[in-house]
Swiss-Prot record:
Residues 1-78, 154-208 are annotated as: Disordered. Residues 40-51 have a biased composition (Basic residues). This is Uncharacterized protein C29E4.11. It comes from the Eukaryota. Residues 179-197 have a biased composition (Polar residues). It comes from Caenorhabditis elegans.
Length: 208
């Protein structure tokens, strides 16, 4: 035995029952990477639920601004009123009751849809077949002549004229309110400025 063997002795060779090809150092067992409780009866933490509960929040402002409009009568026996009526002189007038029957709304309009409330009211008195549905409005909105009653209100400045401009940049308005004190009864003057304040107006779409 030389000096090298004394300094670096070989490992002791103990008798082994393994096959000669398996007589090597076995790899270490894998480490426990959980670093948690290693007891056999230990239950692992349950994963967090990812399903969300149904939302109970109120609808967004866009949903509230665009309610669905009914396009059919409320009852099977109720007939839809005509939206437009053309007089003998060729004047085409919008029927407010037809819009009330289908649901009110407001959009930007052109000046061809401007309607005189006075002409509408006076024409209703002339028509025996109730072409404009005044009876229909009075049955469902008995307080429509009251200035405090609004089917749908859209605030506008009192300083602004309810008249439409030539390019149709304003909104169309039909007044479902009582006329002002200077004109208690609607007349066929064609002047829209004598039918109450602009805040008494409802706005209806021309191309419903």
């Amino acid at each position: 035995m030389d000096l090298f063997d004394l300094i670096f002795p070989p490992p002791p060779q103990s008798p082994s029952k393994l096959h000669p090809t398996q007589n090597h150092i076995l790899p270490p067992e894998p480490l426990n990477r959980d670093f948690g409780d290693t007891r056999k009866n230990h239950k692992k933490a349950q994963p967090r639920r990812t399903t969300k509960a149904p939302s109970t929040s109120s609808p967004t402002i866009h949903d509230r601004q665009t309610p669905p409009r009914p396009t059919t009568p409320k009852s099977p026996t109720e007939k839809l009123l005509p939206i437009y009526h053309k007089f003998a002189d060729g004047t085409e007038v919008v029927n407010p009751a037809a819009y009330a029957q289908r649901g009110f709304g407001w959009v930007k309009q052109n000046n061809t849809a401007r309607v005189s409330w006075a002409k509408w009211a006076q024409s209703t008195k002339k028509c025996d077949d109730d072409i404009y549905g005044l009876k229909w409005i009075e049955e469902r909105y008995p307080n429509w002549r009251d200035s405090n009653f609004r089917i749908r209100e859209r605030r506008r400045s009192r300083s602004r004229s309810p008249q439409l401009s030539d390019n149709g940049s304003e909104d169309i308005s039909i007044y479902l309110g009582r006329a002002n004190s200077s004109s208690p009864n609607p007349t066929a003057t064609g002047s829209e400025t004598s039918y109450g304040s602009p805040t008494d107006a409802i706005y209806i779409p021309r191309n419903y």
